[in-house]
Amino acid sequence: VINNNDNNVAELSLGLKDASGSADVLNVELYGADGKTGAQNGIDDIIFTAIETLNITSDVVSVLGNEQLTTTSESNLITDISADTALTTVNVSGNDKITLTVGAEAALLSSLDASGMTYDAVLTTSAASAVTVKLGSGNDTINFGTTLTGADTVTDGGNRTATTADRLTATISGLSTVTGTGNLNIS
């Protein structure tokens, strides 16, 4: 559990006592402070090796019971997830805004699942492998950079308004399956 309370964390090295298995899971819960920017609720780099699944929960420190990271600048922020090729799955859930980047080191990432997010998620992946992305019910953005190929798939999570549709950004060399009835804005 990471309770930022208006403090940016530089590097955070995590691991398991025994990560020798083939189905190791690391759970990270983020609790940002309401009224603070992503930089203030941020982690520059989460570093780990030999873990196949990373589960991230994005929430807010609750004092009054009604806080939420809702403004444009508010967010739980992970600037980089530095994993090795063992990482194949990242699951993101929670009810408060999150911005995260999975670094290119996670070359075998195959699933980036934010379907458990009920608020906005801004996700970036640089994985060269085929990635299946599932977005949540918020106003989500997925960035592939230059790694989007015909083998990647994106499923929208139900945010289907004309002005706040889920967004995909990439330098497109190929676009494969996009499912759902929402709008897909490509820029």
Describe the predicted segments one by one.
Residues V1-S187:
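Solvent-exposed, low-complexity segments and loops of surface/extracellular structural proteins
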